[in-house]
Structure formats: structure tokens, C-alpha cells
Amino acid sequence: MNRLLQRQLFLENLLVGVNSTFHQMQKHSINTCCRSLQRILDHLILLQTIHSPAFRLDRMQLRQMQTLACLWIHRRNHDLQATLDVINWISP
């Protein structure tokens, strides 16, 4: 297995773990604003990757940043400006 394939497999496994944790939390405590943030970021990721020859790995990395941003927002205050700041920060 070459190095790039190993890296991709590692990131896929990491992402599954991060998403699993996020969805377990979501069932119990993630507020509506966090779910809204998730939808906004899903849309941004789609816009950023639909017109470019993005590799699967690029999409996964964007998705991972999105999930971590949602967790970050949830742990902090549920504040619109903070949400917008995070969106600006993770958007290339």
C-alpha cells in the first residue's frame, strides 16, 4: 500500500470516528443553531467542490473541518457572530 493510500485510509477512519462522536452528541445536546451551521457548511463545501476537480480526500478534509467547527461552536456560546466567524475561518 503506497503512502497516499495509507494517508487516505487513515483520514477516512479518523473522519468516521469524529462524525460518530458528533452524531452521538447531536442526539442529546446540540442546539438548533449548530444544526443550522451544519447545513450552511454542507452547502459551502458543495459550492467549493462541485466546480473543481476535488479529490475525495479534499472533500473529507473539508467535512472534517466542518464537523470540528460545529463541535467548537457548541462548546462555546451559541452566538450568530461566532458562527459567522467560524464559517469565514474555515472557508478557503
Curated annotation (Swiss-Prot):
UniProt family annotation: Belongs to the rotavirus A NSP6 family.
| Keyword terms | Host cytoplasm, Host mitochondrion
What is the source species? Rotavirus A (strain RVA/Human/Philippines/L26/1987/G12P1B[4]) (RV-A)
Tell me yes or no: is Kinase among this UniProt entry's keywords: no
- Quaternary structure, from the entry: Interacts with NSP2 and NSP5.
- What is this protein called in UniProt? Non-structural protein 6
Please indicate if the UniProt record lists tRNA processing as a keyword. Answer: no
The cross-references to InterPro entries, in alphabetical order and at most eight, read: Rotavirus_NSP6
